[in-house]
Amino acid sequence: MNNKKTLLAVAISGMMFATSAAAVDFHGYARSGIGWTSGGGEQTALQVNGGGSKYRLGNETETYVELKLGQELFKEGNKSIYLDSNIAYSVDQQVDWEATDPALREINVQFKNFAEDLLPDATLWAGKRFYQRHDVHMNDFYYWDISGPGAGVENINLGFGKLSLAVTRNTEGGATATYGTDKVYYIDDNGQIQSRFEERKANVYNDVFDIRLAELNVNPNGKLEIGFDYGNAHTKNGYYLEPGASKNGYMITLEHTQGEFFGGFNKFVAQYATDSMTSWNTGHSQGSSVNNNGHMLRLIDHGVVQFSPKVEMMYALIYEKTDLDNNQGKTWYSAGIRPMYKWNKTMSTLIELGYDRIKDQSSGEKNDLAKITLAQQWQAGDSIWARPAIRVFGTYGRWNDKFNITDRTNAGYKAKDAEFVAGVQFEAWW
């Protein structure tokens, strides 16, 4: 293990050296810190029971790093070929030496202007990629994200907008809802060779076909993006999905971006998904499941406004209703704001207020969580997006669970309680 880690460190050091020796681009993201919880022990994250995201400020408990290296490998006129990569790490920030295997998040090649005469400005790409992801920064919620291994052509200039076509895959490894049979030989108690058929499990391959039409000018400083994603599951010959598995589904997305919006921007998003696309509601598909037949409706409004040269604010409103045929769906309500007051160009104070509610489809019961964070921050510039940043924070959260209570109590908490967290964190992107 030590040799493995040493070789990895040498490889990264070599790549870092290459950034100064050749035209290699080095980008990335990182966060880390230390925190304490009023109930004792290390910092704990405050997240609504049944929810998939949380308001981030003063509420992140892991060390997370993405290291991106890329280089233009070919350039001729307007044509160019770019190699991009991304290795990610995540540890619990508990001790000095925390060993973890890296995750290869991206490795792809992008050929810009590959068909300059026929498709000017279009890019042909293939490989693993973060593909045109859309998210709410405050709670790290990726509402449109089909990232994975794939291929496509993007930014085809149609004159009135840009068209992108892609296919990506997310495989369900050894999915429990996928079956086949193997003939197995064995020796019985009498020493005779016998045979029987045993059930086996195998992967389910979910392909997502993505069509996007972006940069549609619909009003002054306003642009519309329209997307359609179709997910379809398939298996190897000799295997089959469990009866009732969703197998396929689709998701439709409309996103309006308003620029020059009170000194910032506003995004309004409407999404509708069916069946296999309702498991995560992001654009990824889970066709092996028998528990995701149904539909989802989501509305999001988020952005940034600048009230004065001294004050900026992030905001987010989310409504998501998933109605499932088995009555196991949920409705998610979320609202948050993060105002920032700038004392000078490199020092600021931030407050984040976040509220999440999950309503159970079958019982109508609700789980709630509210949190407030006060943070003093030193950052590289006077924008709310300025990074790197070092922040000292205090966070107070209160929750009240009415269903799936054991998910909370099994983790050592009461169904209705509160917690105070304090700590120091840095965050950087470059």
Swiss-Prot record:
| Keyword terms of this UniProt record | Cell outer membrane, Ion transport, Membrane, Porin, Signal, Sugar transport, Transmembrane, Transmembrane beta strand, Transport
Would you tell me the Gene Ontology cellular component terms?
Answer: cell outer membrane; pore complex
Q: What induces it?
A: By maltose.
Enumerate the residues marked as the site Important in sugar transport: 142
One Pfam family from the record = LamB
The family database entries (SUPFAM superfamilies) matched by this protein are listed as: Porins
Q: How does it assemble?
A: Homotrimer formed of three 18-stranded antiparallel beta-barrels, containing three independent channels.
The protein here is known as: Maltoporin
> What organism is recorded for this protein?
Actinobacillus succinogenes (strain ATCC 55618 / DSM 22257 / CCUG 43843 / 130Z)
